[in-house]
């Protein structure tokens, strides 16, 4: 399943988040990062594929102390076509 994660890092946590990101010591079991795009400030977006919502929850939980994350499920063109076909 495809997901978009929109994140916002609170100002007081920017340095800690940068340090954690620099070590890339994050658990990704069951999750594949497609890409990350960072704004100049404290926000960004990540595209990923997850086997299930538990894998996604575990991934996002490890960042929950430093930032707010909104998770949005996504569909491919093919999946949208299946929805439209009924």
Where are these regions (language model features)?
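Conserved, structured core segments of small domains
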Residues: 1-86
């Amino acid at each position: 399943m495809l997901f978009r994660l929109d994140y916002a890092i609170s100002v007081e946590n920017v340095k800690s988040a940068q340090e954690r990101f620099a070590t890339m010591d994050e658990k990704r079991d069951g999750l594949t990062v497609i890409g990350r795009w960072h704004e100049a400030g404290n926000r960004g977006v990540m595209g990923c594929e997850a086997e299930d919502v538990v894998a996604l929850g575990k991934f996002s939980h490890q960042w929950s102390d430093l930032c707010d994350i909104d998770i949005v499920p996504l569909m491919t063109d093919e999946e949208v076509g299946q929805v439209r076909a009924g």
